[in-house]
From Swiss-Prot:
Gene Ontology CC terms: Atg12-Atg5-Atg16 complex; autophagosome; phagophore; phagophore assembly site membrane
Protein name in UniProt: Autophagy protein 5
Keywords per UniProt: Autophagy, Isopeptide bond, Membrane, Protein transport, Transport, Ubl conjugation
Keyword Lipoprotein: no
Glycyl lysine isopeptide (Lys-Gly) (interchain with G-Cter in ATG12) cross-link, chain position(s): 113
GO biological process, one term: autophagosome assembly
Subunit structure: Conjugated with ATG12.
Species per Swiss-Prot/TrEMBL record: Yarrowia lipolytica (strain CLIB 122 / E 150)
Entry similarity comment: Belongs to the ATG5 family.
PANTHER family: AUTOPHAGY PROTEIN 5
Encoding gene, per UniProt annotation: ATG5
Positions of transmembrane segments: none
Main location: membrane
Lineage, top ranks: Eukaryota, Fungi, Dikarya, Ascomycota, Saccharomycotina
Protein task: Involved in cytoplasm to vacuole transport (Cvt) and autophagic vesicle formation. Autophagy is essential for maintenance of amino acid levels and protein synthesis under nitrogen starvation. Required for selective autophagic degradation of the nucleus (nucleophagy). Also required for mitophagy, which eliminates defective or superfluous mitochondria in order to fulfill cellular energy requirements and prevent excess ROS production.
Length: 256
């Protein structure tokens, strides 16, 4: 996706600020205000630069702020072009260089462990994976082998019907047009034994954005480009829409 000096998009990303990176980007199709957190998903061919933090889908939801309920706002494809032939020094403080694929794998494993600690209070399920299964899981992620990946992923997850026993659901909420991410600690059930809804969780953690538990008034919750109804059971949503790192990433879109 790009010429020999262009970039190859992958599902890994890093970030910097637009105002400090202006000279490195010759074409950003999305209108981004100065200073907005820019999440880039790229690998520059000549310099073999790999970068990682956010998946490109999450980046799109978070940074465009587009309302999925309005089809006229969809922008596809989302094109980011990295200028790699500048005379000035590469901005290594903003766009991280990843030396090897093993570095990416190690980061992903770390995220899996972090999610496991949130669910179980420890990382034993991930640590107990055999080397063969760990490598097989990674290879399937790289090759987009959905069936193989989730056949192993399900072995380190509590069964969905046992979700009530989960210590807390691994959830990260991203505030609109900012660099703030909230790692929410959310129990799958309320104190009275009822299943927690996404509306209850967002109202509890972000009452300014969600003054109501049942109706979006100020912002909408978006996962994988789809608006999530606030009455959705959070545990069910987690099992249906978690990312390959074991987290459910929720971005907020402001209501105009």
């Amino acid at each position: 996706m790009g010429d020999k000096r262009g970039l190859v998009l992958d599902e890994t990303a890093t970030y910097g600020t637009v105002d400090r990176l202006t000279g490195w980007f010759r074409n950003v199709c999305i209108q981004l205000p100065e200073g907005t957190l820019l999440v880039l998903c790229c690998c520059a061919v000549e310099q073999r630069i790999g970068v990682t933090t956010f998946s490109i889908g999450l980046s799109y939801d978070l940074l465009t702020g587009l309302d999925p309920s309005n089809p006229d706002t969809v922008q596809s494809p989302w094109i980011l072009t990295l200028q790699v032939d500048q005379k000035e020094e590469y901005p290594k403080g903003l766009l991280l260089r990843i030396p090897t694929k093993q570095t990416l794998k190690d980061y992903w494993i770390h995220q899996l462990k972090e999610a496991c600690v949130s669910r179980d209070g420890n990382a034993n399920r991930v640590m107990s994976l055999s080397n063969a299964n760990s490598q097989k899981m990674w290879d399937s992620l790289v090759s987009h082998d959905f069936k193989t990946f989730w056949s192993i992923m399900t072995t380190i997850l509590p069964r969905e019907k046992d979700s009530g026993a989960i210590r807390s659901l691994p959830i990260k909420v991203y505030l609109p047009m900012s660099n703030q991410c909230i790692a929410a600690i959310v129990k799958p059930e309320t104190d009275d034994g009822k299943l927690t809804t996404i509306g209850q969780s967002l109202h509890s953690h972000l009452p300014t954005f969600f003054p109501s538990e049942t109706k979006p008034v100020v912002a909408r919750a978006v996962v994988h480009g789809v608006e999530v109804p606030l009455n959705a059971v959070l545990a069910n949503l987690y099992y249906m829409a978690m990312y390959p790192d074991g987290f459910l990433h929720i971005s907020l879109v402001m209501i105009n």
